[in-house]
UniProtKB/Swiss-Prot annotation:
InterPro entries according to UniProt: DisA/LigA_HHH, GIY-YIG_endonuc, GIY-YIG_endonuc_sf, GIY-YIG_UvrC_Cho, Hlx-hairpin-Hlx_DNA-bd_motif, RuvA_2-like, UVR_dom, UVR_dom_sf
Keyword Calcium: no
PANTHER family with a match to the protein in the record: UVRABC SYSTEM PROTEIN C, UVRC/OXIDOREDUCTASE
Domain GIY-YIG span(s) in chain numbering: 12-91
Name the record gives this protein: UvrABC system protein C
Species of the source: Geotalea daltonii (strain DSM 22248 / JCM 15807 / FRC-32)
Length: 622
């Protein structure tokens, strides 16, 4: 184990730190604004609260660091190193999930960047992908400091009496209030796009030309703004090693394991490795055909298509594939198979990523099976609980009561089988009666036995469990097992200085004493995760209903908006939320809504914003 004395030479600057074990295996890669402070926090009693940290530090024998000029550079370098080394304690596989991109429509008067899930071929420019929304937001946060583009829709900003707080922070140029010309704003937007594409030399060239032109025209204030922007870009431009010359490219590697084909996709943007994605599927044909099929399947989705796709092996007749990709992208796309140099090294890195992902999938599957087997034994179940459902209730003193059902298959969320229930037959605060109604609707007569779960979990103790077992008994459902997961309780004795909590307990039918699983064990963490997901899903639905009711009450209180006009508004916009977001012009287009009524409606919905430059123009649904 490493000692705290060995980190005294760490600088107080931004950078990336790499933790290794005695065999020089990379265990963890992290970034920090202040390297010395961050590393020292691992040794402090009040340090990092993640439970893995105590196990991590017991194995760490060496910590190395790489100093960067900016936090943004550290963020990008951290992601690059994680993709390269796949450290055990950074492990957070996001396979087959939606990634995020940044979108900017340059055809609008004042383009803005937004985070989106799908890349559509609508003429806008897309940047990414990013493995999480938080990664995309981190990039935006740094970008706004260099290129102060607007953050919100123009209509939203114009409702305010003066520019928003971001303008005061110099992170928005306030085009909504005429603080910048369209020409200058478009220069910022183009600079931001080139910056995201890694074309920093082009940005500096364009901005130097604009600075010179402004100075020649004796527009010295404008020239000074470009001068400051150029200096900021020069300071912020990443010193990260460029791994390949050229523009954007995707590098593909694969690993075959029996009938399972594992594919790794590395994203290079502006010559820099920015991310990766892994896929796995059954494939009985040869590898060449498998890669060709993957290209077809992947790039025909709504994804970004780069100018070059680098393959580990040649595919039969690549020209038609190139032509199709060119048509989809609207520009030239080349498919290459490198034989030497940096691109061959990148292909080898992609192959290594595919091998690692395959091993991790296999290990995760074996671990998941072991967890389910432990649950079967500890809860005395008759079969392995491959399909688990969990239910929860959310209400405020019986008002707007809702129920939720979440489903997990082999320990993973099966969101296609999530369900929400609006409780209709219970008018008072009676959770047991609400659960009885929800279970009766879920297991109503005629439900196919194939649709039954192996195990049902209820959020609660013996009372909630009894409701479930009575409903199952009344419906003569005998092949579904049940359990109640009761949260831990606070145990505080008089005079005690610390608060202690009891263990979480699992109640079973026809058993007086609950089963107590070892705290922080994998089986208990799985049950708790399922229980918490059911609670989240129920609360989210309840908040949505509360928001709708609030807006409906607002509509009813507006003079001139009767039942007929409310129905017409809902028919036109489709939801109460969209009514609240509508512009004055959009309200005027509704049949039966005159200009006077539309103005009254719009003012009523946005009256809280007057005098508050940072107030949200929308009803808070969350």
């Amino acid at each position: 184990m490493i000692e705290i004395d060995s980190i005294g030479h760490f600088p107080s600057s931004p950078g990336v730190y790499i933790m290794k074990d005695a065999e020089a295996t990379v265990l963890y890669v992290g970034k920090a604004r202040d390297l010395r402070k961050r590393i020292r926090s691992y040794f402090a009693a009040s340090g990092d609260s993640r439970y893995q940290i105590r196990f991590l530090m017991a194995r760490v024998t060496d910590i190395q660091f790489i100093v960067t000029d900016t936090e943004k550079e550290a963020l990008i370098l951290e992601n690059t190193l994680i993709k390269k080394y796949r450290p055990k304690y950074n492990f957070n596989l996001r396979d087959d999930k939606t990634y995020f991109s940044l979108r900017m429509d340059m055809s609008s008067d004042f383009p803005r960047l937004s985070i989106i899930r799908k890349v559509t071929r609508d003429g806008a420019r897309y940047f990414g992908p990013y493995s999480s929304a938080s990664d995309a937001r981190a990039v935006l946060k740094h970008l706004y400091k260099l290129f102060p583009l607007r953050h919100y829709p123009m209509e939203t900003c114009r409702r305010r009496n003066r520019p928003c707080l971001f303008y005061q922070l110099k992170q928005c140029s306030a085009p909504c209030h005429g603080k910048i010309s369209r020409e200058d704003y478009m220069a910022l937007a183009e600079g931001a796009a080139l910056f995201l594409e890694g074309k920093n030399r082009e940005i500096l060239k364009i901005f130097r030309e604009r600075m010179s032109a402004a100075a020649a025209a004796e527009k010295y204030e404008k020239a000074a703004r470009f001068r400051d922007l150029i200096r900021s870009i020069e300071v912020t431009v990443e010193k990260q090693k460029v791994v390949a010359q050229g523009g954007d490219s995707d590098v593909i590697g694969f690993y075959r394991e029996g009938e399972q084909l594992h594919i790794a996709l590395l994203f290079l943007r502006g010559g820099t490795l920015t991310g990766s994605r892994n896929y796995s599927f059954s494939w009985e044909m040869d590898d060449h055909e498998g890669i060709a099929s993957f290209l077809n399947e992947y790039y025909n989705q709504e994804v970004f298509i780069p100018s070059e796709i680098v393959l580990p092996i040649a595919i039969a007749d690549p020209l038609p594939q190139e032509e199709l990709l060119c048509e989809l992208r609207g520009r030239r796309v080349s498919i290459t198979v490198p034989q030497r140099g940096n691109k061959l090294e990148l292909v080898r890195l992609a192959i290594k990523n595919a091998e690692t992902a395959a091993a991790e999938r296999k290990k995760a599957a074996e671990s998941g099976e072991a967890i389910l087997q432990t649950l079967k034994e500890r809860l005395h179940l008759h079969k392995l609980p491959r399909r688990i459902e969990c239910y929860d209730i959310s209400n405020i003193q019986g008002q707007m009561a809702v129920g939720s059902k979440v489903a997990f298959v082999d320990g993973k969320a099966d969101k296609a089988h999530y369900r929400r229930y609006r409780i209709k037959g219970v008018s008072q605060s009676d959770d047991f009666a609400m659960m009885r109604e929800m279970f009766s609707r879920r297991f109503k007569p005629g439900t196919a036995p194939d649709d039954y779960p192996d195990l049902i979990i209820v959020d609660g103790g013996i009372g909630q469990l009894n409701v479930l077992t009575h409903v199952l008994g009344d419906l003569q459902i005998t092949d579904v097992e049940a359990a109640g997961l009761a949260k831990s309780r606070v145990d505080r004795e008089m005079g005690a200085t610390e608060i202690s909590r009891s263990d979480e307990r699992v109640f079973l039918p026809n058993r007086k004493n609950p089963v107590v699983l070892r705290q922080n064990s994998a089986p208990l963490l799985l049950l708790a995760r399922i229980r918490d997901e059911a609670h989240r899903f129920a609360v989210a639905y309840h908040k949505k209903l509360r928001g709708n009711k609030l807006l409906a009450s607002q509509l009813e209180a507006i003079p001139g908006i009767g039942i007929k006009r409310r129905k017409e508004l809902l028919r036109h916009f489709g939801s109460l939320k969209k009514i609240s977001e509508a512009t004055l012009e959009e309200l005027r287009q509704v049949q039966g809504i005159s200009a006077t009524v539309a103005e009254s409606l719009w003012k009523h919905l946005h009256e809280n914003e007057k005098g508050d430059t940072n107030a949200s123009p929308f009803v808070n649904f969350e």
